[in-house]
Amino acid sequence: MGIWQGQSRRKATGGKYKIVVKKHKKEMGRESAETHLTDDTKIKIVRVAGGNKKVKLLRTNYANVMDPKTNTCKKVSISNVVGNDANKHYIRRNIITKGAIIETEMGKAKVTSRPGQSGIVNAILINE
């Protein structure tokens, strides 16, 4: 069964709306690509609206970390997910989303990209 993101057929009171238009393909959704921290890298290319392509990062172990002091970027390996405000269970499952705090070779970094949408993990080094 697909994920549908259109208007609900029921009102808040439980009554039904009168159906005026049918369901459209543009209202379809997909399951989120929860980027896991593993030893290998796996991506999935999906066709989206307008014939464009979206690169979903499913598994990874590297991140592009920028050091704001030296203004340089370096590809480093990720060792652990330390914090994630999106969901507290993502820390235990090592799932990387935008805003997650990751432990890298350079130190702790905050993820600035959306790995499930852009296909890459970009992060900025945080000072503690």
Swiss-Prot record:
GO (cellular component) term, any one: ribonucleoprotein complex
One GO-annotated biological process of the protein: translation
Signal sequence bounds: none
Classification via InterPro entries: Ribosomal_eS8, Ribosomal_protein_eS8_arc, Ribosomal_Se8/biogenesis_NSA2
Sorted UniProt keywords: Ribonucleoprotein, Ribosomal protein
Entry keyword Ribonucleoprotein: yes
GO molecular function: structural constituent of ribosome
Pfam families in alphabetical order: Ribosomal_S8e
UniProt family annotation: Belongs to the eukaryotic ribosomal protein eS8 family.
HAMAP family registered for this protein in UniProt: Ribosomal_eS8
NCBIfam families named in the record: eS8 (TIGR00307)
Subunit (UniProt): Part of the 30S ribosomal subunit.
Designated name of the protein: Small ribosomal subunit protein eS8
Organism: Methanococcus aeolicus (strain ATCC BAA-1280 / DSM 17508 / OCM 812 / Nankai-3)
